[in-house]
Amino acid sequence: MSGEGPPVNGRELLRIFVPLECPVCGGVPFDGSPNMLCRECLAGIRFLKGPYCPGCGGEHKGFLAMCPECLSAGKKKRWDGAVAAFAMTGMIKELLHSCKYQGQPELARVIGDLAFMAASDRLPEADCIVPVPLHWRRMLRRGFNQSQYIAERLSVHMGIPCERLLKRVRYTGQQAKLGRADRIANLSGAFSVPDSTNVKNRAILLVDDVMTTGSTLSAAAQALKRAGAGAVYVFCAARRQRI
């Protein structure tokens, strides 16, 4: 019929019935997608730029094989490769703080989508994605695990399952104010794998929201390796480098 227009796709219908807006300021999303920031808020994010350190995924422009922080850690990191999306500063720092401490779990999904957009070309091939778990006491207080939400968004984009294969069996308290040695000691025996048959010989992408020294990810990766994982790669949305 001559009066018919072009077909309306799902995104256009969503725009009609549920107007999309930047989850931070309410402005117009950069590309009209759900979970997307506006142009101004995106400008406040510092995306990590290569070359990248293979040990932690952070920026590394020196002539050495890894960044000084990873070299000083020696063989304490238990993973096979690392990817990071953002520097822990500016808008990403604000988003993570609001997510974790102001009860806004939806922001973790925003971060997950942005992180995939930033690092999709660096993500390794994996059989599944595993979020770093919270201890039940912290989960009870916060009500959600931000790393789980980030991992779920990566799962959607990468087309591989997100599986809860790790359990945090020991409460470790706050890590943020501890030095490297204290962090490592604090995390000893903190993680376990309840069913090793789900891990054996699989390549796993281990996901956390922030990496500082890498102690939490190292302890979690070690538990997966001991349970028989073929390879463990780590992904953090934000990298806090001390150099």
Question: Language-model features: where?
Answer:
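Glycine-rich phosphate/pyrophosphate-handling loop used in enzymes and phosphotransfer proteins
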Residues: M1-V207, T212-I243
